[in-house]
Amino acid sequence: MNMAPTLATACASLPPEGALAPRGGPSALMTHGTALIMAGGTGGHIFPGLALAHALRERGWRVHWLGGAGTASQPSMESQLVPPQGFAFESIDFSGVRGKGLGTLVRLPWRLLRACWQSVALLRRVQPDVVLGLGGYITLPAGLMSVLLGKALILHEQNSVAGMANKVLARFATRVFTAFPDVLPNGHWVGNPLRAAFLQVPDPATRFAGRAGPLKLLVLGGSLGARALNDIVPRALALLPPQARPIVTHQSGARQIDALRANYAGAGVQAELTPFIDDTAQAMAGADLVLCRAGASTVTEIAAVGAAALFVPFPSAVDDHQTSNARFLVDQGAGWLKPQSELSPEWLADMLQKTERIELMGRGLEAKKLQKLDATHKIVAACEEVVR
């Protein structure tokens, strides 16, 4: 497995699914519109946005990206990931308010007014034909100002519980798309935009044919890692007899790789440990079981691959949206859900020892039934409709 050294490798398998071909041969590469994509804060907003950005550019669009700049010591994720992909990166001075204290709330009206003023200047300079919002605090002021200036606003909500910005903007939007059903009153359920690699994986029955020996466990902590998983998984494995342990690949995030190595060494357990995984689609496909959080992109990718997953939602996620995301699959028999407060080394060791490969294949098949693969195509088509 090729392990990547930086966050940017998570974009390696772009362009996205559908890889919409330019229309009408060489002449179709002529620019026929300008899109401003608004997304930032987390990979759950950024990676679907990048999938759409590549698809639009392949169709001849100019693409600008609006995100947060972050700080000199801690730049935003989007400011690191987007420019290397060749898209013009713009930023305004605005940040989230949840959990920031009373002082931040008191200053919110002034900060929002300033961000709206900056957004107007940006929109007049870029002159987008379509403004495409994918959630995150940064989308609120620019989305409101795009409506005020008469721009077409298209939204995509990645989670099963809509964020504040999309809840506000949805009532003014030209079109609204969602990754899960019944999220917004006027939303069209299309799934999440996916990178191409997730569409090139054999189905679960083909992958599991002929598999034997120890189970293969893939632990995904995400770009920032999941400390609870990093602590509990090595201890759970240590409770199993060596011959009953699965073959483990554990991805921790760069900040926690040293602590993870110490945890496994202390438990006396062997595993493949890495801060990042270059090809997540192939890693999921090669595993019998995936142990992970339940961010929107992860849940969508699990369904696209048809992988059996044990979801441990991040307990501090806004509106507990990760639990809701996971239930979309789990309620259909496509995985397991275990709250972090209930996850213990003893429970996990027992689960790993009792679970058979045939059951894991079945869970993967159920997940595959819930895949939605044409989100990029439908959203790009909507962008093109509004400029005709």
UniProtKB/Swiss-Prot annotation:
SUPFAM superfamilies: UDP-Glycosyltransferase/glycogen phosphorylase. Gene3D superfamilies: Glycogen Phosphorylase B. It is a peripheral membrane protein. GO terms for biological process: carbohydrate metabolic process; cell division; cell wall organization; lipid glycosylation; peptidoglycan biosynthetic process; regulation of cell shape. GO terms for molecular function: UDP-N-acetyl-D-glucosamine:N-acetylmuramoyl-L-alanyl-D-glutamyl-meso-2,6-diaminopimelyl-D-alanyl-D-alanine-diphosphoundecaprenol 4-beta-N-acetylglucosaminlytransferase activity; undecaprenyldiphospho-muramoylpentapeptide beta-N-acetylglucosaminyltransferase activity. Cell wall formation. Catalyzes the transfer of a GlcNAc subunit on undecaprenyl-pyrophosphoryl-MurNAc-pentapeptide (lipid intermediate I) to form undecaprenyl-pyrophosphoryl-MurNAc-(pentapeptide)GlcNAc (lipid intermediate II). HAMAP family: MurG. This is UDP-N-acetylglucosamine--N-acetylmuramyl-(pentapeptide) pyrophosphoryl-undecaprenol N-acetylglucosamine transferase. The gene is murG.
